[in-house]
């Protein structure tokens, strides 16, 4: 049976660092308040001339290089994002153009912070079908464009960044071992941008009421996350026919330190085996899990044969996890 996995990873974060002390200058908050409640110290913000597709392209070039393939070997692009360059056009098509590729199918996928994991399962299924050989999966966001810099409860949480993976055939016995994804649509109002869509188009009133920015019911998100992360990871492990102690490392969605700590306790898995970089990048939504994995690979923390879990949750509400036996 064909084994399918990640052939190469890449990630990119903008150069502009925005610290908690920078927030102290513009809103009523403090480094201590942010750090103790979230675990975040700083985050990256895209420059004025950078769009989501620009970040995605940078990460993609690194993934292609690390997969040791040429750009022309890529036969599909899937871009998970909530912050596409334009409303009526998929940013994946813009990435295709920036990479200098032609004709290959490209589409955006919106599963909020779980988007990268959703994209991995879609790519896995398409490669398994035999229709495609090397699918580029990207998670990319410019969340700084949709956060309200007057709302201290949300603006301090988010950052910009991108991660990309090449999905294709890997050495037999390695690669994806199990997936679990799902959604609870009845909770769709917990995390959203109220205006700007077909339900409530932007107008003078929505802009005045600051409805074109992210709003979030923090306590509801916390409760959902700490209960869902262990369950969805356990389900993916069951499909992979593994136990939690078979894992070398877990790469959780980088939303909040307290969420990750609570999930670790419920999973009865050592916190030190949860890779975390949210202190430096904040919550980059669909990019967060991929950025964490890409960074860990660069540091030599992920080795061939390691069993790792990628797990996340997001607006929708969505959730997902995949278990991978690392192939290189």
From Swiss-Prot:
Pathway: Lipid metabolism; fatty acid biosynthesis. InterPro entries: ACP_syn_III_C, ACP_syn_III_N, FabH, Thiolase-like. The keyword Transferase applies. Its EC number is 2.3.1.180. The active site is at 113, 253, 283. Homodimer. NCBIfam families: fabH (TIGR00747), PRK09352.1 (NF006829). This is Beta-ketoacyl-[acyl-carrier-protein] synthase III. It comes from Fusobacterium nucleatum subsp. nucleatum (strain ATCC 25586 / DSM 15643 / BCRC 10681 / CIP 101130 / JCM 8532 / KCTC 2640 / LMG 13131 / VPI 4355).
